[in-house]
Structure formats: structure tokens, C-alpha cells
Curated annotation (Swiss-Prot):
CDD domains: PseudoU_synth_ScPUS7 (cd02576). The active site is at D256. SUPFAM superfamilies: Pseudouridine synthase. Keywords: Acetylation, Cytoplasm, Isomerase, mRNA processing, mRNA splicing, Nucleus, Ribosome biogenesis, rRNA processing, tRNA processing. This is Multisubstrate pseudouridine synthase 7. The modification N-acetylserine is found at S2. PANTHER family: PSEUDOURIDYLATE SYNTHASE PUS7L (PTHR13326:SF21), TRNA PSEUDOURIDINE SYNTHASE D (PTHR13326). It is found in: Nucleus; Cytoplasm.
């Protein structure tokens, strides 16, 4: 763009198609049904920054390995999986003759053993001679016995346990029965000794197990490499296997489900050996790169993410300009001018009814309507849930619908379970209060997601209007972050329930740009932010934009200056988000291929496995030692992009600006196949 301050904008429909095709598309949009799902315009995504540049057609996420995400930590380091933990020390293998000789020696030692006379006398006073002889026999023969006497006093029992350990050199195990007698058996001295020797090899200077990773501390940080799973799902698997509560695991940000991702995770109150052992059972996930830390990770503890994206089946629809020229010019514009930092379509769900629509009803305290929207029989829902939705629509029998609802439908299950345990009114319906109770049974992070989606819809709509009115030109009344104000926006918030973009904004304030700021070139368009509606944000002093907040919320029977609610979860403080994002370190490659199932980029795990194989002299694939697979030619064309984005920015919005395509689930850019 020759003059970035005079940005022109068009709706996505007009980006790179001819007039006749454009008219056909407009007609198609007017005639679309619920089956089409949510489209960009439904959630405020309407403009491009560089509409004059041609885009290209292609599809993302045909395979989950087409979308790689690596977290960037607060020091700017890109997180990669470079090891798969450590191997536990192996017990030395011994011959059968050695084992038998050791057993014979051990048996002879036990036969010759005599309890210290003074300690034996104490045992006789407690148990009697007959039981002491039986205890000595247990020591020598590995039998078991139970004492004749019982001992009611706990302090006495404790002393007896200690006396037995002392008398028999910790080689007997004693337990108290329900009747307060003692059951005594011989412990396995060899296994205990070997275990202790193994542990001693892996302790730090303070005697704490560390497996060679330095001084032990309260938290273990590790890299999580996952495939085709979202972060919450992966964390739930780990906590279930370790049998620990979810609160002991923290992470800086959630990562895409349909992707291969790497991120740092912290865990507390768990041994490193137990954590490391997970790699034997994890599927589609692997952990490694451990280190000890004094502090846990928290949401927002990252600078952003690095993306490697494969766009397959690329065509231009333009015979006058080469693909190389289109991609080159598009990437240049994207690097220099950026893209509108819209909340992406992922924010609004994949069902026919957008999450922001449900969020609106929650903010209006329309509990029944919100619940009915969640449970409604829609065209675009999880297919396995359609029978349950049909039952609910026809019978309002919560218990019957619950039996058919798939467990993975968390919100629906919570609603139906709660309603099935409540009484109906005389007319056979549930009360508004019953629906409210059911809504509050939805996991908190999920029910707050709905209202955050509504905030995102408003933000997108305002951002489109801001660019439409003023392009990339800074104007008086725009908002920028006030770096002199360090006080938090809100206090006492549990960060487990907030997205990384919301969490980050809790610690910043904004101020309005003045004419003096503009004259001194103190700020650029990259500094401009817009608030999502809330009770603790500053709205733009530009009257047009401020009025737009009023108009949008008024249409939904709300007031941007009154966002507090009686229900704390739905009382929104608001947050700030930059209007423009510029990808960093943007590079591209054009690759040709034939097989649609051919993997075109390598994951961290691919690279690690083949690098290790090469170093150990084993068979390896040379093509899998680097991120990019070699171009072997073919009739199909793919564009591979690599770039970095800041916290909470959506890679699909950067791709949208480059390709000039609709990013909704049923749009031209997406061809989602769930398991490849």
C-alpha cells in the first residue's frame, strides 16, 4: 500500500472475484440457511486492509500436521520439544546362578541372626515367649503371623512398631489390625535396598529426588507436544493419569485443537519420575524438557506464538499474475501494514448458533432462552448429539435427553443433569429459576466463554467501523495503552477462568490520543487499542466510535456503561486489544506435490526422532531432519507460511488478509477432516 494512512477497505466478498461471480455470491448469501453455519459478517468481520491486492484460493488444516504452533515465552524464546524426558536407571541383569547364590547366602544370614538380648526381653514382656518365637520364625522363614494380644493404646502401638524395626534391623513389616493386634511379615530387603540405591543416584545435594535436573524446587516446568487435541483436553488426560486435581497444572495460553502444538506447562506436588513415566501411556502427546522452578506458569505468561501453516490446493483464479507474485506482494503488505486483529471464527464456535448469541442472553439474564439455545436442535452440531436434542425439543424430558447426550457435550450435559433433578411447574415447564440453576452448573470457564464471545462480537464490529471511518490514520480520541499507569484493571480474579487475551489486559490502562500526540508522532496505528465492553474500561472519546458502542448494545437491550451484573461470572470488566497486528519473521515457500495425504512440514517430534536416530547410527529419514520437506514436484501446489504473532492474535485472521477468503468453518479456506 503506497500510503498506509489512507487505507481503503472492502468487504471480503469483493476481494478478488469478478462482478458476475460477486453478484452470484451475494445472492447465495441472501439465500443461505442455518445449515451454512456462522459467517464472518455475522460476528463483525467485514474488512481487509489491502483489498486492492489479489488473493488466492487454498485450504488450511486438511491435515492437523498442516498447522504447527510453537509458543514464544516471555524471553522471546520459541518453545520446541528437544528431548523426551529421561530413561530410568535399569537394574543390572544377573545370572540365575548369581541370584541363587545370593538367596542361599541371605537364608544362611537369617538363620544365624539373633535378636539383641535386651531388645528380645522387651519383646517377651510385650508379646510373651510364644509369640516372640513365632516372630523369629517369620524372620527366618518368610511366613506370616498375628499376635495373640491386642493393644488399645495408640502410643503403645507406635512404640511396638519402632521396637520391632529396631530389633530386626528394619527387615520385618508390622501392621495394626482392626482388632488392634499386630500382623507381622518379612519385608523384601533386597528390593528395598536396590530401590534406595537407585533413588540415591538421582538426588540433589539436599537429598531430594531431581534426576539430574538441578536443585529441586516447588514446581516442575515441562514442554507439552500434542497432536489434534486442545490444551484443556491434554491437561485433563495428564491430571487423570496422575490422579491429581486440575489446579496443580498451569499453562500460559491455550493452543489450537486441530494442530500440532508445543507449549510450556507447570505442575506442582508431583515427583519428576511419576511425571516422566507418563510418556509410556500418553497417546498423541509427549512431554520433555524438564526444569525445576520456584513459580508456576500463569495465563498470559508468553509473548506470542510461532506458526507454520500449510495451505493446500492453491489456485489463483488470475492468469495475468503468477502465484509467486501474488504471495510475495501479499506477504510484503502483511509485514508492513499488518491485518485487522479480529477475534477469529474459533471464538464463536462451530455450531449453527454462535456462542455470542448465547452470551447475549446470559448478559440479559434470559436463563431459559440461553439454555434452550444451547440445547436446541441445530443443523450444525455434533452429529451424535442430534437425537438428544430432538428428544428435548419434542418432550422436554431432561432425564431421557440426558441418556442420549454424548459426554463430550459438557454444557448440554450439565444443563440436562440439573434440570432432571428439578421439579417442573404445574404447566409442565421449568421455571426461570430452574434454568438459572442449570446454567450455573455449566463449568465456569465454559459459561464465561459465552459472554466473552459477545464481547468479541462487539469488539469486531467496532474495529471494522474504526478502520472504515479512518483507515490506518491516527485520530484524536483513539485509545492507546497508558504505560505510566500500572494498576490492575481488576483484582481478585481467578485466572484459570480467563483467556490469555483477557488475562493480559487486567494489568493495563488506556488513555485518549491528543492532537499533540499526533503532531509529535508519539504513537502509530500499531499502538491503537479498542476496549471490549465492560465496567472498568475507557471508551474512545471519538464520538462516532463511542456512539457505535451505544448503538450496538442498545440493539441488544444493553448499555456499554452498565456492564455489572448480579451474577459475578457475567459482570464484565472489559479489556483492551490492539486494532492492528503485524506478523514478525514472515517467510513463505511454494511447494509442489501429488499425494493429498503427503506431509509437507515436519513436527518437532519428527525432527527429534530422526535426529536421535541419526546420532545413534540407526535408520533415519534425511527429509525429516528439518522443518520443511523437500519439494519433489507434482501437479498440486501448496504455500507454506511461517510467522510469529503476539498474544491472543488469530493466525486465521492473518491468512484471511493474505488470501482474501472467508474463514468460517464452511468457508472457502477450510476443509476440515477430523482425524488426518
Amino acid at each position: 500500500m503506497s500510503d498506509s494512512s489512507e487505507a481503503t477497505v472492502k468487504r471480503p466478498l469483493d476481494a478478488h472475484v469478478g462482478p458476475s461471480e460477486n453478484a452470484a455470491k451475494k445472492l447465495k448469501i441472501e439465500q443461505r440457511t442455518q445449515a451454512d453455519g456462522i459467517h464472518e459478517a455475522d460476528v463483525g468481520i467485514t474488512l481487509f486492509l489491502s483489498p486492492e491486492l489479489p488473493g488466492f484460493r487454498g485450504q488450511i488444516k486438511q491435515r492437523y500436521t498442516d498447522f504447527l504452533v510453537n509458543e514464544i515465552d516471555q524471553e522471546g524464546k520459541v518453545i520446541h520439544l528437544t528431548d523426551k524426558g529421561f530413561k530410568m536407571p535399569k537394574k543390572p541383569q544377573r545370572s540365575k546362578e548369581e541370584v541363587n547364590a545370593e538367596k542361599e547366602s541371605e537364608a544362611a544370614r537369617r538363620q544365624e541372626f539373633n535378636v539383641d538380648p535386651e531388645l528380645r526381653n522387651q519383646l517377651v514382656e510385650i508379646f510373651g515367649e510364644e509369640d516372640v518365637l513365632k516372630i523369629e520364625s517369620v524372620y527366618r522363614t518368610a511366613n506370616k503371623m498375628e499376635t495373640a494380644k491386642n493393644f488399645e493404646d495408640k502410643s503403645v502401638r507406635t512404640k511396638i512398631h519402632q521396637l520391632l524395626r529396631e530389633a530386626f534391623k528394619n527387615e520385618l513389616e508390622s501392621v495394626t489390625t482392626d482388632t488392634n493386634t499386630f500382623k507381622i511379615a518379612r519385608s523384601n530387603r533386597n528390593s528395598r535396598t536396590n530401590k534406595q540405591e537407585k533413588i540415591n543416584q538421582t538426588r540433589d545435594a539436599n537429598g531430594v529426588e531431581n534426576w539430574g535436573y538441578g536443585p529441586s524446587k516447588d514446581f516442575i516446568h515441562f514442554t507439552l507436544h500434542k497432536e489434534n487435541k486442545d490444551t484443556m483436553e491434554a491437561v485433563n488426560v495428564i491430571t487423570k493419569l496422575l490422579r491429581v486435581p486440575s489446579r496443580v497444572i498451569r499453562y500460559a495460553g491455550t493452543k489450537d485443537r486441530r494442530a500440532v502444538t508445543c507449549q510450556r506447562v507447570s505442575i506442582s506436588k508431583i515427583g519428576l519420575d511419576r511425571l516422566n513415566a507418563l510418556n509410556r501411556t500418553l497417546k498423541g502427546m509427549i512431554i520433555g524438557n524438564y526444569n525445576f522452578s520456584d513459580a508456576s506458569l500463569n495465563l498470559g505468561d508468553l509473548k506470542g506464538n510461532e506458526f507454520v501453516v500449510v495451505i493446500r490446493d492453491v489456485t489463483t483464479g488470475n492468469s495475468e499474475v503468477s502465484l509467486e507474485e501474488i504471495v510475495s506482494n501479499g506477504c510484503k503488505s502483511l509485514s508492513e501494514n499488518g491485518f485487522i486483529n479480529y477475534f477469529g471464527m474459533q471464538r464463536f464456535g462451530t455450531f449453527s448458533i454462535s456462542t455470542h448469541t448465547i452470551g447475549r442472553e446470559l448478559l440479559l439474564s434470559n436463563w431459559k432462552k440461553a439454555a434452550e439455545l444451547i440445547l436446541s436442535d441445530q443443523d450444525n452440531v455434533l452429529p451424535k448429539s442430534k437425537e438428544a436434542r430432538k428428544i428435548w425439543a419434542e418432550t422436554k424430558d431432561a432425564a431421557l435427553a440426558l441418556k442420549q447426550m454424548p459426554r463430550q457435550c459438557l454444557a448440554e450435559n450439565a444443563l440436562l443433569y440439573s434440570l432432571s433433578n428439578q421439579r417442573k411447574e404445574e404447566d409442565g415447564t421449568y421455571s426461570e429459576n430452574a434454568y438459572y440453576t442449570a446454567i450455573m452448573k455449566i463449568p465456569r470457564n465454559l459459561r464465561t466463554m459465552y459472554v466473552h464471545a459477545y464481547q468479541s462480537y462487539v469488539w469486531n464490529s467496532i474495529a471494522s467501523k474504526r478502520i472504515e471511518l479512518h483507515g490506518l490514520k491516527l485520530v484524536v480520541g483513539d485509545l492507546v495503552i497508558d504505560t505510566s499507569e500500572k494498576s490492575p484493571l481488576i483484582s481478585g480474579i481467578d485466572d484459570e477462568d480467563f483467556d490469555e487475551d483477557v488475562r493480559e489486559a487486567q494489568f493495563i490502562r488506556a488513555k485518549a490520543v491528543t492532537q499533540e500526540d499526533i503532531d509529535s508522532v508519539k504513537y502509530t496505528m500499531e499502538d491503537v487499542v479498542l476496549p471490549s465492553p465492560g465496567f472498568d474500561v475507557l471508551y474512545p472519546s471519538n464520538e462516532e466510535l463511542k456512539q457505535l458502542y451505544v448503538d450496538i448494545l442498545k440493539a441488544d437491550n444493553m448499555d456499554p456503561f452498565n456492564m455489572r451484573r448480579k451474577v459475578r461470572d457475567f459482570s464484565l470488566a472489559g479489556s483492551y486489544r490492539t486494532v492492528i497486528q503485524k506478523p514478525k519473521s514472515l517467510e513463505y515457500r511454494i511447494i509442489h506435490y501429488d499425494d493429498p495425504s503427503q506431509q509437507l512440514v515436519n513436527t518437532d517430534l519428527d525432527i527429534l526422532n530422526n535426529t536421535r536416530a541419526k546420532e545413534s547410527g540407526q535408520k533415519y529419514m534425511k527429509a525429516k531432519l528439518d522443518r520443511y520437506m523437500p519439494d519433489k514436484g507434482g501437479e498440486k501446489t501448496a504455500v507454506v507460511l511461517k510467522f510469529q504473532l503476539g498474544t491472543s492474535a488469530y493466525a486465521t485472521m492473518a491468512l484471511r488478509e493474505l488470501m482474501k477468503l472467508e474463514t468460517s468453518r464452511r468457508g472457502d479456506m477450510c476443509d476440515v477432516k477430523e482425524n488426518i
